[in-house]
Structure formats: structure tokens, C-alpha cells
Regions:
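Short acidic-hydrophobic, aromatic-tinged amphipathic segments that line or gate anion-handling sites
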Residues: 148-157
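Residues at alpha-helix caps and immediate loop-helix transition turns in enzyme cores, especially N-
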Residues: 35-36, 66, 245-246
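Active-site HxH/HxHxD metal-binding segment of metal-dependent hydrolases
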Residues: 31-32, 42-149
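A general structural detector for well-ordered alpha-helical segments in enzyme core domains, enriched
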Residues: 39, 66, 70, 216-219, ...
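Conserved beta-strand hairpin/beta-sheet module of binuclear metal-dependent hydrolase folds
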Residues: 1-44, 180-197
């Protein structure tokens, strides 16, 4: 079951609860880390010892900056999941990709997300993961690389990772390292910023803030054609639900 963490800052964070353990997706701030712990222990009646994985759908500031704080409260066996491109960011071999449509794509989402910011901890960030010139090479993590699992790079686009029926799906376009999480049995898709939940019709839309428009368009066509997601949990905005499959209703990018 997918649980959205309430009011945890600019980006949505999710706790995925399965019988065998817990997956946390996108702890984007120190406040998000605290609220995730509260949801796990108080809301779900679970132990932080049950957290198997903490994942980032992409290496942007509003999705990664609670990772270290949350990981410090988890058992030594808990792994952090990144796309394989993040290894190059951390090694200084590659910078974060430049982004397009800051005013028309990013600003409206940031403004709409302000209602989820409840305090200073929800905007308590480091400087890592900022896709701006002079800052896009400052990619650091505040924990041991031994805790990290880098996925992808072998030609596949869907990966099992040892968490039941859940798969990681590569969904590049918003960034080159974007990944989503999909469960074909439940029809749940945690999309990161690939799909957003701010469309007034409640059906969602493909992100207008992106690294590569054509790649993003191809990614959406592939996902729409090859999987069915009755429940889409976006990186920003509200969840999108439709019996059977919500993907055909998502507003795509157009040429």
C-alpha cells in the first residue's frame, strides 16, 4: 500500500508498505524525514527497522535532502537506491543536466506546492542537487557510499529490486536519471516528476519542466503503451486515480 506523507514540503514523499518491509520514496527535506518516521512508527504502527529501501526518483534538491537524516534512523541493512547516472554526479564526472522552462514549468509547480510547506524544516535543504550553472556540479551525500545501490545501465528499462512485485522503471526526460516505481499487481505507479498531479481535471499531466522534451515525450508514449496504472502518485500534486488505467487520461506534451 502506498501512503503519501502529509505536508512534507515542496515535493511529495511516499511510504510503501508491504508485508515484508517498507520502501520510502523521495524524502526531500529534513522535515520530510521527521514526518516519514512519524508516519511509519505512529501512523502505521511499524518499526524503522522494517525500512528496507530509501529511494530518490531523481537527484534534485527537493527529492534528496532528507535522505541522510532518514537513513540515520534506519538499520544498517537499509539501502539507498539511485539511478546509475548519480554515480557519475557523485564522482564529479558529470554535472546535473540543465533544465528548461523555469518560468512556465517550474515556477507554477513551486507556487502550488507552497501549501504543503508547514515549517522551516520542510524547506531545510543543503546545496546538493541544484540544477543551476555553478551549482549543478555540487553533488554530495551525507552518508557512506556503501549504503547505495545504483540501478540501470545494462540496457533494460524495468528492474526488480527485491521488494515484492515492485519494479523500478527508467522514465528519463524530466532528468536523465529519472526513475519511477511500479507494481503491476496493484496498479500503483510512483512517478516522481515525470507526471504531475496539478491538472484541474484531476487526470494529471506530463511535466513541463524538463531536461529533454523529446526524451520525455518518448518516455510517456512507452509507459502509456506498455503498463497500466490505476493509481499514479506524482512528485508534486495530488494522486491520480482511474479504474483500470489512469495513464490514457494524463495530459501529454505536444509538439
Amino acid at each position: 500500500m502506498v501512503h503519501r506523507v502529509a505536508d512534507c514540503g515542496f515535493a511529495n514523499a511516499y511510504v510503501v508498505e508491504e508485508r515484508h518491509g517498507i520502501l520510502v520514496i523521495d524524502p526531500g527535506s529534513r522535515g520530510a524525514a521527521d514526518k516519514i518516521e512519524s508516519l511509519v512508527t505512529d501512523g502505521l504502527g511499524k518499526s524503522m527497522e522494517e525500512v528496507m529501501f530509501i529511494a530518490a526518483t531523481h537527484f534534485h534538491i527537493d527529492h534528496i535532502n532528507g535522505l541522510g537524516r532518514l537513513l540515520s534512523r534506519c538499520p544498517p541493512a537499509t539501502k539507498v537506491i539511485f539511478h546509475h547516472r548519480v554515480r557519475d554526479y557523485l564522482d564529479g564526472k558529470r554535472k546535473l543536466t540543465p533544465m528548461r522552462n523555469w518560468l512556465s514549468g517550474c515556477l507554477p509547480v513551486a507556487i502550488a506546492s507552497l501549501k504543503y510547506v508547514q515549517g522551516i524544516r520542510d524547506i531545510s535543504f543543503g546545496i546538493s542537487g541544484i540544477p543551476l550553472p555553478l551549482l549543478n556540479g555540487l553533488c554530495r551525500i551525507g552518508f557512506s557510499r556503501q549504503r547505495v545501490t545504483f540501478i540501470g545501465g545494462d540496457g533494460r528499462w524495468r528492474y526488480g529490486f527485491g521488494f515484492g512485485d515492485w519494479e523500478i522503471i527508467e522514465t528519463p526526460g524530466h532528468t536523465e536519471d529519472s526513475i519511477s516505481f511500479y507494481n503491476s499487481g496493484s496498479g500503483d505507479l510512483v512517478s516522481g516528476d515525470f507526471i504531475l498531479g496539478y491538472e484541474s481535471c484531476g487526470k494529471g499531466k506530463v511535466a513541463r519542466f524538463y531536461w529533454d522534451r523529446e526524451v520525455l515525450m518518448r518516455t510517456f508514449v512507452r509507459i502509456r503503451n506498455e503498463i497500466k496504472a490505476a493509481n499514479i502518485y506524482p512528485g508534486h500534486g495530488d494522486a491520480i486515480h482511474s479504474p483500470g488505467n489512469a495513464l490514457p487520461g494524463v495530459q501529454p506534451l505536444t509538439l
